[in-house]
Amino acid sequence: MIPLLLAALLCVPAGALTCYGDSGQPVDWFVVYKLPALRGSGEAAQRGLQYKYLDESSGGWRDGRALINSPEGAVGRSLQPLYRSNTSQLAFLLYNDQPPQPSKAQDSSMRGHTKGVLLLDHDGGFWLVHSVPNFPPPASSAAYSWPHSACTYGQTLLCVSFPFAQFSKMGKQLTYTYPWVYNYQLEGIFAQEFPDLENVVKGHHVSQEPWNSSITLTSQAGAVFQSFAKFSKFGDDLYSGWLAAALGTNLQVQFWHKTVGILPSNCSDIWQVLNVNQIAFPGPAGPSFNSTEDHSKWCVSPKGPWTCVGDMNRNQGEEQRGGGTLCAQLPALWKAFQPLVKNYQPCNGMARKPSRAYKI
């Protein structure tokens, strides 16, 4: 255990703002899968506060060491710098199409269907990509909390630690996804170094083709991620209209099924995009649950090596909205996610047609 802990500490530069794992130590990346309510045993499970935890050295999914509403868990600990009294040396963007404190004057439905946090200092920081409505609370709240509205259903949160320079690329991606930024701090050197982020907080977006963008991001420890972002004028499903062909693989997609205009599994192209219907964690205790109980958004290639975690569903309305996903070919990530697919909607026998050529 001690060598593993030392290795984790050495992988992330000292002084950099990073994701913190369930162990309380810096990690390069982690995934938290908040379980639906009523799945599992005990009062916490009944209230929908339990989660599964994954990072590169966790050996697969583990039970969360805290509850999702605790500041001692991976998510709460990572976000703690937001809620300290002195944040003058930080920059942050909190964005959510369902913000914690919506105003009648706001119309976030015109923005991208996208949720996340950018938090950084002068050495680096992290990108938290998630599916959670009304989250996280603004910095002015001075305390981490989990919204009651996000307890019932499953949710995913992917945190990746990045060097300072990588945030300029993220700024470009957000001009495509067109997020609703409900809380931010971007001053001095941060505004100078990241003009795209400044444009994002001002409500600007891309104004000419192409209406989609993919970029390579390299984490603090050197892990390679691929960010995919589309603007509303892209006018197609993220997964069947772009991602499957760009990655060159079939995809099994988990998304929120309680929306209008759900797109069926798509087998009309070279690469199949299959809707996941049921999720099951390994082991006799599971748990297992249906996609109608799960608000998370992720996809996995059935035979590897790709896994993506993002913020978009497969429905007709979101073909006309911005959003994206963050993908990687990390063995630990794929080996954890691929077995979760217990059942999916099969193809309907539609004839295949030649695929458009996409490059990553």
From Swiss-Prot:
Cystine pairs: C19-C159, C267-C347, C308-C327
Signal peptide: 1-18
Enzyme class: hydrolase
Impact noted for substituting N212Q: Reduced N-glycosylation, complete loss of N-glycosylation
Modification after translation (UniProt): Glycosylated. Genetic variations that affect N-glycosylation sites reduce activity, but enzymatic deglycosylation has no effect.
UniProt-reported outcome of changing N290Q: Reduced N-glycosylation, complete loss of N-glycosylation
Tissue: Expressed in monocytes/macrophages (at protein level).
Gene Ontology CC: one annotated term: extracellular exosome
Top-level taxon of the source organism: Eukaryota
Sugar attachment sites: N86, N212, N266, N290
Catalytic-site annotation from UniProt: H295
This protein's record includes keyword Signal: yes
Annotated effect of mutating C327A: Loss of activity
Keywords: Apoptosis, Developmental protein, Disease variant, Disulfide bond, Endonuclease, Glycoprotein, Hydrolase, Lysosome, Nuclease, Signal
Cellular localization per UniProt: Lysosome
EC number: 3.1.22.1
InterPro entries named in the record: DNase_II (IPR004947)
Catalysed reactions, semicolon-separated: Endonucleolytic cleavage to nucleoside 3'-phosphates and 3'-phosphooligonucleotide end-products
Effect after changing C347A: Loss of activity
A biological process from GO: apoptotic DNA fragmentation
One term of GO molecular function: DNA binding
Keyword field contains Cell membrane: no
Family under the similarity heading: Belongs to the DNase II family.
Noted disease: Autoinflammatory-pancytopenia syndrome: An autosomal recessive disorder characterized by severe anemia and thrombocytopenia apparent from early infancy, hepatosplenomegaly, and recurrent fevers associated with a hyperinflammatory state. Additional systemic features may include chronic diarrhea, proteinuria with renal disease, liver fibrosis with elevated liver enzymes, deforming arthropathy, and vasculitic skin lesions. Some patients may have motor delay or learning difficulties associated with subcortical white matter lesions on brain imaging.
Function per UniProt: Hydrolyzes DNA under acidic conditions with a preference for double-stranded DNA. Plays a major role in the clearance of nucleic acids generated through apoptosis, hence preventing autoinflammation. Necessary for proper fetal development and for definitive erythropoiesis in fetal liver and bone marrow, where it degrades nuclear DNA expelled from erythroid precursor cells.
Protein name as it appears in the record: Deoxyribonuclease-2-alpha
Originating species: Homo sapiens
Gene: DNASE2
